Amino acid sequence: MPDAPQDRRKWSVLSGLFLVYMASNGITLHTLPLLYPELIETFGWRASEVTLPATIFFIVGALTSPPAGWLLDRYSSRLIIALGGLLLCIGLVAYGMTQTLWQLVAVYALLGLALSLCGLVSNMVMLTSWFATGRGRATGILLMASSLGGALFPFIVGTGLEQSGWRTTVMLAGIGVGIVILGSAWLLLRDGRLASQKVALPPSLSPRGVGSLNAALKERRFYAIIFITGSLWFIIIALTQHQSIHLARDIGLSKTLLPAVFSLFFGSSVIGKLGFGLLSDRFDLHKVMAVSILLLAVALLLLAQLSALDRALLYLYAVMAGIGFSGTFTCIQLLVASHYSGSHYGRILAIVVLIDTLCGALG
């Protein structure tokens, strides 16, 4: 009975993290590209100029992840998430006031910094501090938020573009995102380090890597993890960024069918995130991760055999690729947490995210 309030609190924290991750990822990664045609029409910029700020966004986000990880290990993750949410709100409001390309580049740099403070690393640090057991299920639920944000925010912003124009829409979206993240930080999020320290874990559930960052950097295991996750991230980003071009241009798939394939792909990704999170709680994580990688590999083989006329094979690819990609992504987060959920977890995870992001950029 004494543990009941603690259990309720950790699920309340998870609900707050879900809202934060949905808002931060939903707007920055899945929605802002909708504004590219509006920017081209308003300013007469070339496509290469419009996408330049997004490149800066990913570079800044990657480079600021290690400092953010250091802050998360030393200070309140709740406070850092709130700071990231505030910067995200300011950046989106400034986006709506943009007049020149260099201003847009500066805005995207600010958004990259904001996401490094309130994005995946900070969410996983807080989640890991609360969920010593059932971490796979909790991680799967958290990562589902990105898929929900990817479905929700483009619809909302797309409606706003038609009714109010891009400037008003992006500023209102910024205010809304700020309210969601800051409200969640105030009402739902709580730092969990002290709470988790009160729980005496059995040896089988104790973190296997609680050393310092310096100790991790001397381990072959750490570099093996980076090689595995970096390689997988290269494949995942290459798949998600280029599959639409391949299906339409190389396979000859009708553009009217692309939305259905993508809906099936991302719908299956929700199943993959939760499903592989649950499986990792019941079975050996490394074996579960191997299954997710195998599914992804089979999906890639199917992709090489696709034709525009074989609808069944096309939909099978979408399901297997969605489940395989999302399951692998979930297992990557759990792999790092299972080995390094100690006092330097934030720093170690941030370095892994930095390497993975750079590998993804190559993809």
Give the predicted meaning of each segment.
Residues 12-47, 64-68, 153-154, 237-245, ...:
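Extracytoplasmic
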Residues 39, 117-131, 327-340:
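Intracellular juxtamembrane helix-capping segments at the cytosolic ends
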Residues 28-39, 214-276, 363:
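Extracytoplasmic gate region of multi-pass secondary transporters
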Residues 141, 150, 325-326, 339-363:
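A late C-terminal transmembrane helix in Major Facilitator Superfamily
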Residues 257, 263-275, 280-335:
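C-terminal transmembrane helical hairpin of 12-TM major facilitator-type secondary transporters
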Residues 63-102, 280, 286:
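Conserved MFS/SLC helix-loop-helix module at the cytosolic interface between two early adjacent transmembrane helices
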Residues 145-193:
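Helix-loop-helix hairpin linking two adjacent transmembrane segments in secondary transporters
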Residues 22, 91, 102-118, 230, ...:
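Hydrophobic core of transmembrane alpha-helices in multi-pass small-molecule transporters
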